[in-house]
Regions:
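Switch II (G3) loop of P-loop NTPases
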Residues: 34, 132-138, 146-171
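Short, well-ordered beta-strand core segments
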Residues: 4, 28, 182-183
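Walker A (P-loop) phosphate-binding motif
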Residues: 1-25
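Iron-sulfur cluster-binding cysteine motifs and their immediate structural context
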Residues: 71-89, 100-115
Length: 285
């Protein structure tokens, strides 16, 4: 089962939830899809690290064969190509590596070269296999890295926890495509409702079963909880505003490995999520 954990912004508690769920599961895989700022490995401190380069294909033209017909330039809808002063110019950052220019070039003047955009790091931490995507500084998009992460995860026959990027943009969409269930993490504020609504709309578009974890809850009014009740959204768990839990997390510690009360909290959450996911799967068959 693949469980994606997402939130409308950073700092909501997405990594807190995904790291502790992966740690409390008997045998699991934690995948950090937040390739711009991966931090899950800082908690797990995995051993026996392995690294794999992630590359994309970029076009290059043979000046001896290129006639300047501009077929490739006209084809590219991303404006990644320009023909200037008798030379084909490739804008690497805009290219989506679709390969269309290579296919449509009538002179067969275009070939492809590899360009590294990041890496995938994997290792072991106790009962958890920890996999992190890491995008090189200055890159425009981490989607190819996430695609590679998810491609590799299809081989896993374990519970897989996907720590998604914050927000609801392209990288988040790519992260949840293969998810069996989505956990939306929200804060108990009016601003938290706005962020929750963004990812709520996203999972509905992707027709993914989902539930909400309310983090940093106080005894006061909870606008995020009100939003869930109004929209008949399943509340999976309410995590209280807890100085001890926050301090552990800020110090890079995994709460379920440090204190039995947090182990019980996240174990109950895992049981609830598993039950909800099985129920949704049964409803679809």
């Amino acid at each position: 089962m693949k469980i994606a954990v997402l939130s409308g912004k950073g700092g909501t508690g997405k990594t807190l939830v995904s790291v502790n769920l992966a740690a409390v599961a008997l045998d699991s895989v934690y995948i950090d899809c937040d390739v711009e700022e991966p931090n899950g490995h800082l908690f797990f401190q995995p051993k026996d690290l392995q690294k794999e380069r992630v590359t994309v294909k970029l076009p290059q033209a043979d000046p001896e064969l290129c006639t300047g017909c501009r077929t490739c330039v006209n084809f590219c809808k991303f404006n990644a190509l320009a023909y200037i002063k008798n030379k084909l110019i490739v804008f690497n950052e805009v290219c989506h590596s679709c390969g269309g220019c290579l296919l449509f070039c009538p002179q067969k003047a275009i070939s492809e070269k590899e360009r590294e955009i990041g890496l995938i790091q994997s290792g072991i931490s106790g009962n958890v296999r920890v996999v992190s995507g890491m995008m090189n500084i200055g890159e425009v998009s981490g989607v190819p890295i996430i695609k590679k992460l998810l491609q590799d995860s299809r081989k896993e026959n374990k519970n897989v926890f996907l720590d998604c990027p914050p927000g609801s943009a392209c990288m988040v969409m790519e992260s949840i495509k293969d998810a069996d269930y989505c956990i939306l993490v929200a804060e108990p504020t009016v601003f938290g409702v706005h962020n929750l609504e963004m990812v709520y709309e996203l999972v509905r578009i992707f027709q993914k079963p989902f539930g909400v974890v309310l983090n940093k809850c106080l005894e006061e009014e909870n606008p995020a909880e009100d939003f869930c009740l109004q929209n008949q959204i399943t509340i999976l768990e309410k995590i209280p505003f807890d100085l001890e839990l926050g301090t552990m997390h800020s110090n890079g510690q995994i709460a379920v490995r440090k204190h039995p009360k947090y182990k019980e909290l996240f174990l109950n959450l895992l049981k609830t999520v598993s039950k909800e996911a099985r129920h949704e799967t049964a409803s679809d068959t």
